[in-house]
Amino acid sequence: MRILYRLLKMADDTVKCYLECCKSSHPKLPLPHNVPVIIGRTPELGITDKLCSRSQLELTSNCYKRYVLVKRLGANTSQINGIDIEKNKSSRLEEGQDLHVVNGKFPHRVYFTGCQNDTKTEKAVVPKLPTKSTDLTKSDLSIKQPERKKLKVSENKSKVLNSKIKPQEKFSSESVYAFDSPSPMSSRCEKKAESNKRAPTHKHWSQGLKASMEDPELVVKEDEQIVVIKDKYPKAKYHWLILPKDSISSTKNLSTDNIELLKHILKVGQELAAEVKDKQPDVEFRFGYHAVASMSQMHMHVISQDFQSSSFKTKKHWNSFTTDYFVDATDIINELETGGKVKDRRTMTSLLNEPLKCHRCKKPQKNIPTLKKHIDSCQK
């Protein structure tokens, strides 16, 4: 039991968790294992926004399982990957996920350090011994000799420790720790590090757009403010997404400061559509946002109204682009200009279950295949 206690204590000392600002606005903040840490509008984070409470979030790390429990204490919303954290409830934050401290602002991430070797069983560094050609005085030899004696003592201690640990090897692989070597914790951590190298980290699907923004096969164009990508699963013949380079999780986190950015996004989308319409004047386009964000990065859709695509398969796909669930980009801009914020449209999710009907003549359709055939021949 003493050995297990020492090893558990050693793991707490070697596996570290840190909170890091994505914009490097402050030094990394340590999150000790199983110790609640309060963050918010504090000098440590450099946050001065009054919408952020001084005690906005409570973070409790689990260094063994490598995740952090995030509890929202403040009145205003906080998000993990664009999904709101309910007040006084805890949500799980893992490595690679984005934590926005308040209202989609101040993005942070957590990361865990690797394990360090057990210094108690670590091999001692043997001092270089003098060669025959080296001239040493008797006083020099008297200084060197005690060091060699100390080394022997440490080796003997190591042998005693090894003899105590070896009987524990009969534990099964299902035990908390398997004592396979004189340094069980370091061996266990090395194996975990090797398995991590072999198996790539799988990010949550809601983070897919951030990876696509760096995929040269998907990127169409970019400038200092935005990136244009081809939709990986297009729902029409022409379907692009325009994303800001700033971390903005959804339209509900927009403010009047973002109006010029939204106008720029719309202008770029209209230019893309114009390039197509120069060659195919009959192609119709819409520019807009979904009422409720499903991804962790805000994006505007530029989509043609033919809806001819093999990726267009479900009623929810259809209703997300042909009902009020699809909000015109100009409406979002107008709401910010007149009211200073974007309307809360969370109740609009019910529109995704509306019966199928043609977006032109409004005639009900039986299923997706019949709807696609109807669109080809439908006239307003």
From Swiss-Prot:
It comes from Ciona intestinalis (Transparent sea squirt). It catalyses: a 5'-end adenosine-5'-diphospho-5'-2'-deoxyribonucleoside-DNA + H2O = a 5'-end 5'-phospho-2'-deoxyribonucleoside-DNA + AMP + 2 H(+); a 5'-end adenosine-5'-diphospho-5'-ribonucleoside-2'-deoxyribonucleotide-DNA + H2O = a 5'-end 5'-phospho-ribonucleoside-2'-deoxyribonucleotide-DNA + AMP + 2 H(+); a 3'-end 2'-deoxyribonucleotide-3'-diphospho-5'-guanosine-DNA + H2O = a 3'-end 2'-deoxyribonucleotide 3'-phosphate-DNA + GMP + 2 H(+). This is Aprataxin. Disulfide bonds: none annotated. DNA-binding protein involved in single-strand DNA break repair, double-strand DNA break repair and base excision repair. Resolves abortive DNA ligation intermediates formed either at base excision sites, or when DNA ligases attempt to repair non-ligatable breaks induced by reactive oxygen species. Catalyzes the release of adenylate groups covalently linked to 5'-phosphate termini, resulting in the production of 5'-phosphate termini that can be efficiently rejoined. A zinc finger (C2H2-type) spans 356-378. One of its GO terms (biological process) is single strand break repair. The gene is APTX. The keyword Chloroplast does not apply. Residues 206-312 form the HIT domain. InterPro entries: FHA_2, Histidine_triad_CS, HIT-like, HIT-like_sf, SMAD_FHA_dom_sf, Znf-C2HE. Keywords: DNA damage, DNA repair, DNA-binding, Hydrolase, Metal-binding, Nucleus, Zinc, Zinc-finger. Residues 176-207 are annotated as: Disordered. Residues 36-85 form the FHA-like domain.
